[in-house]
């Protein structure tokens, strides 16, 4: 992996109806209905809104057999109206419902935490190695039964692990760890590989973006060790709504997309499902438009470990670096910034105010001014660019800020 230059990870291709995923295909975007799956017309109308917004896939939950069976009516009505976007059934707890859905829709998502294992009860279970192997045999037998149906009906499968619903069996052996999350997925993946079933998509989701990122990276490494390159679905659970939901999704999904990881995404917001699509599109375009950028000749930090998120050690400058909490710098020149309206803990650590008079701004935060107008005074610091870099030796300040773009440093 190149840590400095964007390259999308090369995955295998998964066939999902008329819209294949992975390989050289674009990053696909999807959303999920929040209507009752037993009610055909509301599901159809909402699905159409999602599709018209630009979704490549529409996912619907199927809690029971009746809901799974009604997917046929929903699909039929969508086709009648000229919509042939692949549908995905979301299944929990009941493998029999997954069997039913696999005969109808183009893709079925199952949760390894409750597909065969009982629902999580937070009870610690003790297994000998032989007993644990027997549990894997049960899982394998039932999963193969499901895969045979998928093969017959050309149905794709997403193995979708949720951090919050790992089985008691996995939790008892691996604990609440990224390693346990990954193993929950790998148990099913190994069966897919043995059975030569390749229309598979994987996902690891968590409401904690740090856990999500680390677990997905670990999954990629584990797959590479075992000769697998299945495509990835990215998403953050319980992202929320408004600005918070968008920021959380950008942190979790965006970080992995920047790594080149991800073949389909869903931005999960507590809003109308169709509102998720433009957010997802903007996020994907922001990352993928950087493909083919001017090469960056970076040097990897010697102690950097892709699978361990440890903060880089740095020198302390004022209240920045070392063990200090990362500081925030806000641009007071932006049109939508209301300095007077910001109160209390919402204040940034620093305001950038350009060439303006620092005394015209509240002293509740430090102020950063352009170096060519800097005058020494408490809580005010200079900012240097390539044009003003020559002033660095002559200006005395406890902290000096430098602003350069990568091409300017090369």
Positions of predicted regions on the chain:
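N-terminal amphipathic alpha-helix/helix-capping segment at the start of soluble metabolic enzymes
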Residues: 1-32, 147, 151-153, 289-338
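Alpha-helix-loop-beta-strand connector modules within alpha/beta enzyme cores
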Residues: 65-89, 137-154, 219-228, 289, ...
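Hydrophobic or amphipathic alpha-helical targeting/insertion segments
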Residues: 84-123, 129-149, 154
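Catalytic alpha/beta core domains of metabolic enzymes, predominantly
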Residues: 126-140, 170-321, 389-390, 395-410
């Amino acid at each position: 992996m190149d840590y400095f230059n964007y390259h999308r990870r090369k995955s295998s291709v998964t066939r999902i109806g008329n819209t294949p995923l992975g390989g050289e295909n674009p990053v696909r975007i999807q959303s999920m209905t929040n209507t009752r799956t037993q009610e055909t017309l509301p599901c159809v109308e909402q699905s159409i809104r999602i599709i018209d917004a630009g979704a490549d896939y529409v996912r619907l939950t199927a809690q029971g057999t009746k809901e799974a069976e009604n997917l046929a009516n929903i699909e039929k009505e969508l086709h009648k109206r000229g919509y042939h976007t692949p549908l995905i059934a979301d299944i929990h707890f009941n493998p029999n419902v997954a069997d039913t859905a696999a005969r109808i829709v183009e893709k079925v998502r199952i949760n390894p935490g409750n597909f065969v294992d009982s629902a999580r009860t937070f009870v610690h279970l003790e297994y000998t190695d032989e007993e644990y192997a027997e549990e894997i045999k049960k899982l394998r037998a039932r999963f193969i039964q499901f895969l045979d149906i998928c093969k017959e009906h050309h149905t794709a499968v997403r193995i979708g692990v949720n951090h919050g619903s790992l089985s008691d069996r996995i939790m008892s052996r691996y604990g609440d760890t990224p390693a346990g999350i990954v193993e929950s997925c790998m148990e099913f993946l190994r069966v897919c590989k043995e059975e030569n079933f390749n229309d598979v998509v994987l996902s690891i989701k968590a409401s904690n973006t740090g856990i999500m990122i680390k677990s997905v990276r670990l999954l990629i490494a584990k797959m590479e060790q075992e000769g697998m390159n299945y495509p990835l679905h990215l998403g953050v659970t319980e992202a929320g709504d408004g600005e918070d939901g968008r920021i959380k999704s950008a942190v979790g999904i965006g970080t992995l997309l920047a790594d080149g990881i991800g073949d389909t995404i869903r931005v999960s917001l507590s809003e109308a499902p169709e509102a998720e699509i433009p957010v997802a599109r903007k996020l994907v375009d922001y990352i993928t438009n950087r493909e083919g950028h001017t090469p960056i000749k970076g040097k990897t930090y010697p102690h950097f470990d892709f699978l361990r998120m440890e903060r880089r050690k740095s020198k302390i400058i004022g209240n920045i670096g070392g063990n200090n909490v990362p500081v925030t710098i806000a641009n007071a020149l932006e049109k939508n910034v209301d300095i007077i309206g910001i109160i209390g803990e919402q204040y940034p650590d620093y305001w950038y105010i350009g060439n303006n008079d620092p005394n015209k701004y509240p002293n509740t935060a430090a102020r950063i001014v352009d170096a060519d107008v800097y005058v020494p005074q408490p809580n005010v610091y200079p900012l240097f660019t390539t044009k003003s870099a020559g002033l660095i030796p002559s200006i005395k300040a406890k902290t000096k800020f430098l602003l350069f773009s990568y091409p300017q440093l090369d």
